[in-house]
């Protein structure tokens, strides 16, 4: 009789362990599926927001009224530096343009604008805009300021509002690329 009770108790313990392992696995699988679903929903929402931002960016380029704030700057020798978007930007509004650079976290201590960079303000001319099959938008224009004139090329990445601006001064080879939104 003791053997039968012992075997019954042993079977009961083994059975409860198997059941517990199965329910734990089911809980883990349910958590994993919920996480995957949440991640897919988040990606879908981000894609929708990016497409709305992309359309707004294209409309701003078409209207000739936009500001591109740079997060980083790439110099002609390939050195990249993160910069403040408050003081590094390209702006166009109703035929007037401003290009401002300020490298406060880099080597330049003195500059014409007092911020460690250059500010060009002037008239915008020669605007051209085209879009390729991938949705990338190419926007080019010239800017003529008091002391400096430059050619500006903007590439708006398809499906997002992320852009790259290449500034090519007409009287020097100091090309500068700014990346931002």
Question: Model features per residue range: what roles?
Answer:
Residues 61-73:
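A short, Trp-centered hydrophobic/proline-enriched beta-strand micro-motif
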Residues 60, 91, 98, 155-157:
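Well-ordered beta-strand positions
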Residues 80-134:
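Mid-length scaffold segments of soluble, non-membrane domains
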Residues 29, 125-181:
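Helix-rich interaction surfaces within compact, conserved domain-sized segments
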Residues 1-27:
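Bacterial Sec-dependent N-terminal signal peptides
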Residues 18-60:
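Sec-dependent signal peptide cleavage junction
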Residues 75-76, 106, 148-151:
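Short beta-strands and strand-coil junctions in structured, solvent-facing domains, enriched
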Residues 52-53, 70-85:
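N-terminal post-signal-peptidase region of extra-cytosolic proteins
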């Amino acid at each position: 009789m003791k053997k039968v009770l012992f075997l019954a108790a042993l079977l009961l313990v083994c059975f409860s362990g198997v059941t517990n392992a199965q329910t734990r696995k089911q809980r883990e699988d349910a958590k994993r599926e919920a996480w995957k679903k949440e991640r897919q929903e988040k990606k879908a929402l981000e894609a929708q927001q990016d497409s709305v931002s992309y359309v707004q960016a294209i409309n701003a380029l078409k209207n000739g009224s936009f500001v591109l704030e740079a997060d980083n700057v790439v110099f002609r020798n390939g050195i990249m530096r993160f910069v403040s978007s408050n003081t590094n930007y390209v702006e166009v509004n109703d035929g007037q343009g401003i290009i401002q650079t300020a490298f406060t976290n880099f080597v330049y201590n003195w500059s014409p604008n007092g911020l460690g960079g250059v500010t060009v303000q002037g008239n915008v001319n020669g605007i051209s805009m085209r879009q390729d099959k991938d949705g990338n938008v190419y926007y080019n224009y010239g800017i003529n300021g008091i002391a400096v004139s430059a050619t500006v090329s903007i590439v708006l990445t398809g499906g997002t509002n992320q852009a790259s601006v290449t500034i090519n001064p007409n009287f020097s080879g100091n090309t500068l690329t700014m990346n931002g939104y």
